[in-house]
């Protein structure tokens, strides 16, 4: 009977996953500290641009977390999640910031317009298309963040691929939609801080849901 090597059993793999998640969570919190300032602001429309500015570091941090968890090891003797996170941050910070800032800009403008619907002279039916645009932009952002975190493409190529894959991989889009609903539900039921503490688990869920997207990009758009 063959014996399992140390660190190769199911308990060891579970322990490795927990270790990876805890380390990545700690690094996520550390690299998004400026964003915590937004939690101290009043929830008023006038503060939305400042909230968006505080949230800018979140994009590169999420990208680094995606990179680290994608390259995570399951062997207890070969766990280096911190090194993978820092490498992902260094490689992808610029691309992730472009994706994140572009999305934040769209969402901030939409949120301000919706909050000032009457003052802006917009009709009530404007809410529905605005929400659809916001949902589509969020689907695009999640795809773009995964692509720019795991592949080396130019921003314009990432933007086009992300939009194309929203339609090409409907299962991924539906899963991402459910993930966004979970996040919004968590924020409404508790607070942004509680959701942030589950950041690494949510990133792992996004990565798991994006397996089909990653496979399509690797097979059809890389050599």
Predicted regions and their residues:
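Helix-coil boundary and N-terminal low-complexity module in membrane systems
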Residues: 1-111, 122-124, 140-142, 147-180, ...
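Membrane-interface helix-capping segments at transmembrane helix termini in multi-pass transporters
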Residues: 114-128
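Small-residue-enriched core segments of transmembrane alpha-helices in multipass membrane transport
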Residues: 130-135, 202
């Amino acid at each position: 009977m063959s014996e399992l090597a140390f660190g190769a059993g199911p308990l060891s793999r579970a322990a490795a996953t927990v270790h990876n998640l805890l380390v990545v969570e700690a690094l996520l919190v550390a690299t998004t500290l400026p964003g915590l300032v937004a939690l101290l602001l009043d929830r008023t429309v006038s503060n939305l641009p400042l909230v968006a500015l505080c949230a800018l570091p979140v994009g590169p941090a999420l990208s680094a977390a995606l990179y680290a968890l994608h390259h995570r090891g399951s062997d207890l003797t070969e766990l280096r999640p911190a090194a993978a996170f820092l490498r992902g941050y260094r490689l992808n910070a610029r691309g992730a910031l472009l994706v994140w800032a572009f999305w934040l800009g769209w969402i901030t403008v939409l949120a301000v317009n919706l909050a000032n619907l009457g003052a802006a002279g917009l009709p009530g039916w404007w809410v529905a298309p605005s929400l659809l645009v916001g949902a589509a932009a969020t689907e695009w952002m999640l795809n773009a963040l995964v692509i720019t975190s795991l592949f080396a493409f130019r921003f314009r190529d990432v933007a086009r691929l992300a939009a194309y894959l929203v339609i090409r991989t409907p299962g991924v889009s539906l899963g991402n939609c459910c993930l966004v609903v979970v996040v919004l539900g968590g924020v409404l039921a508790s607070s942004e801080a509680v959701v942030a503490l589950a950041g690494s688990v949510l990133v792992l869920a996004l990565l798991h849901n994006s397996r089909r997207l990653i496979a399509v990009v690797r097979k059809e758009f890389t050599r």
